[in-house]
C-alpha cells in the first residue's frame, strides 16, 4: 500500500509523553499510532521501534528521543517520547523538542511517583503550556474508588505546580490493551486524542508573534547608514517599522528600519526564518553590537537577574569533570553572545555535579533581552558546560 502524503493543510502541534519510568509512556505512544492508523491518520509504530530511539546531539548534549507523527481529523501532530528520565530532563531544558502540550502518563496501579512530580515541575519551569492526563493500566485496577483517588492525587500535584489541576482533562485507559486491539480500550485512545485536540490550543505561528532579530553582525555602508544582520527569530519586519535595540547597553534605543535586504535583494518585509540585513536610520556603527536584539517596541525588555532551570553536562558529554559551587562565574551564551554571570544555588544545595539538573539564580554583568522560556548555554573557555532555560525574571 502506497504511503499517503501527510496533509500539510492541517494545523501543526508538537506534543510529547511525560511521566514516571515504566508508567507506559512508550506503550501509549505506540497505541496512539496504532489506533489512529486504523483511521488512516498514522503509520502504526510498535513499542520496540519507538523504544530504540536514536541518540541525537543538541548543543553537545547527547539525548535519545523518538519522534513519531500522526494526525487526527483536525490536526497534524509531531510527538516526542524519550526512553530515559535523563533524556527528558535534557530534552525539556534544551528545547530540543519544543512542546506545545504534554500527555502526562500516570499508572493507575502506582499513582504519582517522584518522576511524575519532576516532569510536572520541569514542564512548569520550561514553559510547556498545557497538560492532558492519561491514567494508564486501568485494566489492572478493579476498584473504582482507587481510580478516583489516583485521579485526585494527580490533579492536586498539577495544581501544586500552578497548572489548572481541576480543569485538566483526565482520560482513564490501558495503552497495552489498546495496542493489543481490544475495542473497549481503543475507544479510550480515541477519547484521549479528542481531549488533546480540544484542550491543547494550536500554537501561535512564529510569524504572528512580535518581531525579534538577534544581531549577528554590524557594518556601515557609506552614505546609507548602519546595517545589522541576523536571522529573524520571530514575527515580521517591514520597511518603515520602528524597532528597539535591546540589551548590553544602559538605555534601550529606538530606530526606524529604512531597508530590508536578503541575498542582496531589497525586500518590503522579512519574516521568521529569514536571514536579513536591516538598514537602520540614524544609528551610528558604535551604537549597536552583536548580542543585542532588534525587536518590536515594548515586546521584550533587557534583564540581568533571573531564575533558570539548568542541565549541567556530564564529563562524557565534554562538560566539567568537577562540581561547581555558588558564586561560580561562567559565561552565559544568549542567542549570539556571551555575557558573564554569577550563579546562586537554591537553599540547601551546596554544589552541582556534572550530569545534574538544578534551579539557579543568575545575575549577569550586563542586561540582555530575555523572557521566560529563553534558552541559553553556559560556557567556560569556549566550551559548553551546561544548557538552561529562563524560568522566571527577577529584575
UniProtKB/Swiss-Prot annotation:
This is Elongation factor Tu. It catalyses: GTP + H2O = GDP + phosphate + H(+). Residues 81-84 are annotated as: G3. One of its GO terms (molecular function) is GTP binding. GTP hydrolase that promotes the GTP-dependent binding of aminoacyl-tRNA to the A-site of ribosomes during protein biosynthesis. Keywords: Cytoplasm, Elongation factor, GTP-binding, Hydrolase, Magnesium, Metal-binding, Nucleotide-binding, Protein biosynthesis. NCBIfam families: EF-Tu, PRK00049.1, PRK12735.1, PRK12736.1, small_GTP. Mg(2+) binds at residue 26. It is found in: Cytoplasm. Its main location: cytoplasm. It is an enzyme of class 3 (hydrolase). Monomer. GTP binds at residues 19-26, 81-85, 136-139. PANTHER family: ELONGATION FACTOR TU, MITOCHONDRIAL, ELONGATION FACTOR TU-RELATED. Residues 10-204 form the tr-type G domain. GO terms for cellular component: cytosol. It holds the Pfam family GTP_EFTU_D3. Residues 174-176 are annotated as: G5. Residues 136-139 are annotated as: G4. Residues 19-26 are annotated as: G1. CDD domains: EF_Tu (cd01884), EFTU_II (cd03697), EFTU_III (cd03707). It comes from Bacillus cytotoxicus (strain DSM 22905 / CIP 110041 / 391-98 / NVH 391-98). Residues 60-64 are annotated as: G2. Belongs to the TRAFAC class translation factor GTPase superfamily. Classic translation factor GTPase family. EF-Tu/EF-1A subfamily. Its EC number is 3.6.5.3.
Amino acid at each position: 500500500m502506497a504511503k499517503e502524503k501527510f496533509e500539510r493543510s492541517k494545523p501543526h502541534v508538537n506534543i510529547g509523553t511525560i511521566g514516571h519510568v515504566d508508567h507506559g509512556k512508550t506503550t501509549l505512544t505506540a497505541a496512539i499510532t496504532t489506533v489512529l492508523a486504523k483511521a488512516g491518520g498514522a503509520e502504526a509504530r510498535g513499542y520496540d521501534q519507538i523504544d530504540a530511539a536514536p541518540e541525537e546531539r543538541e548543543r553537545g548534549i547527547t539525548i535519545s528521543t523518538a519522534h513519531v507523527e500522526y494526525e487526527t481529523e483536525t490536526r497534524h501532530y509531531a510527538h516526542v517520547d524519550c526512553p530515559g528520565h535523563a533524556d527528558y530532563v535534557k530534552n525539556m531544558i534544551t528545547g530540543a523538542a519544543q512542546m506545545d502540550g504534554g500527555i502526562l502518563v500516570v499508572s493507575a496501579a502506582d499513582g504519582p511517583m517522584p518522576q511524575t512530580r519532576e516532569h510536572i515541575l520541569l514542564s512548569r519551569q520550561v514553559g510547556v503550556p498545557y497538560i492532558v492526563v492519561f491514567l494508564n493500566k486501568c485494566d489492572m485496577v478493579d476498584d473504582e474508588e482507587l481510580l478516583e483517588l489516583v485521579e485526585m492525587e494527580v490533579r492536586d500535584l498539577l495544581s501544586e505546580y500552578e497548572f489548572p489541576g481541576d480543569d485538566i482533562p483526565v482520560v482513564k485507559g490501558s495503552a497495552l490493551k489498546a495496542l493489543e486491539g481490544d475495542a473497549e480500550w481503543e475507544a479510550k485512545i480515541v477519547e484521549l486524542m479528542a481531549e488533546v485536540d480540544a484542550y491543547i490550543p494550536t500554537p501561535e505561528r512564529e510569524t504572528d508573534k512580535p518581531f525579534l532579530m538577534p544581531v549577528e553582525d554590524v557594518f556601515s555602508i557609506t552614505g546609507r547608514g548602519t546595517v545589522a544582520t541576523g536571522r529573524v527569530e520571530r514575527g515580521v519586519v517591514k520597511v518603515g517599522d520602528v524597532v528597539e535595540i535591546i540589551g548590553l547597553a544602559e538605555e534601550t534605543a529606538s530606530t526606524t528600519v529604512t531597508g530590508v535586504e536578503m541575498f542582496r535583494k531589497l525586500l518590503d518585509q522579512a519574516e521568521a526564518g529569514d536571514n536579513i540585513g536591516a538598514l537602520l536610520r540614524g544609528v551610528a556603527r558604535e551604537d549597536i553590537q552583536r548580542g543585542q536584539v532588534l525587536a518590536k517596541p515594548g515586546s521584550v525588555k533587557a534583564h540581568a537577574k533571573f531564575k533558570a532551570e539548568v542541565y549541567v553536562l556530564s564529563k562524557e558529554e565534554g562538560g566539567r569533570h568537577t562540581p561547581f559551587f555558588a558564586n561560580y562565574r561562567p559565561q552565559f551564551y544568549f542567542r549570539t553572545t556571551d555575557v558573564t554571570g554569577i550563579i546562586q544555588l537554591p537553599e540547601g544545595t551546596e554544589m552541582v555535579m556534572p550530569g545534574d539538573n538544578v534551579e539557579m539564580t543568575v545575575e549577569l554583568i550586563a542586561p540582555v533581552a530575555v523572557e521566560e522560556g529563553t534558552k541559553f548555554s553556559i560556557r567556560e573557555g569556549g566550551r559548553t558546560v551546561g544548557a538552561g532555560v529562563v524560568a522566571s525574571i527577577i529584575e
